[in-house]
Amino acid sequence: MSKIQKNSDNDKLIDSEKKIPTDQDVDKNLLPQENSKNSTLDNTIDIVDSKKTILNVPVNITVELGTSRIKIKDFLKFSKGSMLILNESIKEPLNIFMNGHLIASGEIVVLEEKYGIRITNIKNSLKTINISS
């Protein structure tokens, strides 16, 4: 039995010789946060910086005057002076798109010999966005 005892002791010895984890081997995300206040502050600063970045991204705004559906053969007959009748009435508000997504509606205005649009309605989902920092 002494041989069996020795073998089991040798196994214990071999197990104890296994590599002890170092700082590099430990996943720091699994350890408790020492400075949770600093971490929260850093996260808040990151969010504010991200918000500033997003709010400064340029976008394309398109105002849709109207739509019409015609055949290609009719389009090919167009020449200078041809008129295309649109489906929308002049009394209907114009759709305003941001990067292809409907965001608002409004009415056409002329300012200093340029077209403009007076916003008459903003899509509900956009009204809830807080842009103040």
Curated annotation (Swiss-Prot):
Keyword list, A-Z: Bacterial flagellum, Cell membrane, Chemotaxis, Flagellar rotation, Membrane
Topology class, membrane: Peripheral membrane protein
Keyword Thylakoid included in the entry's annotation: no
One CC-aspect GO term: plasma membrane
GO terms for MF: cytoskeletal motor activity
Cellular compartment(s): Cell membrane; Bacterial flagellum basal body
Biased composition (Basic and acidic residues): 1-28
Classification via InterPro entries: FliN, FliN-like_C, FliN/MopA/SpaO, FliN_T3SS_HrcQb, SpoA-like_sf
Database matches in Pfam families: FliMN_C (PF01052)
Any one GO biological process: bacterial-type flagellum-dependent cell motility
Major localisation: membrane
Top-level taxonomic group: Bacteria
Region called Disordered, residue ranges: 1-39
Function summary: FliN is one of three proteins (FliG, FliN, FliM) that form the rotor-mounted switch complex (C ring), located at the base of the basal body. This complex interacts with the CheY and CheZ chemotaxis proteins, in addition to contacting components of the motor that determine the direction of flagellar rotation.
Family membership: Belongs to the FliN/MopA/SpaO family.
Name this polypeptide is given: Flagellar motor switch protein FliN
Biological source species: Buchnera aphidicola subsp. Acyrthosiphon pisum (strain APS) (Acyrthosiphon pisum symbiotic bacterium)
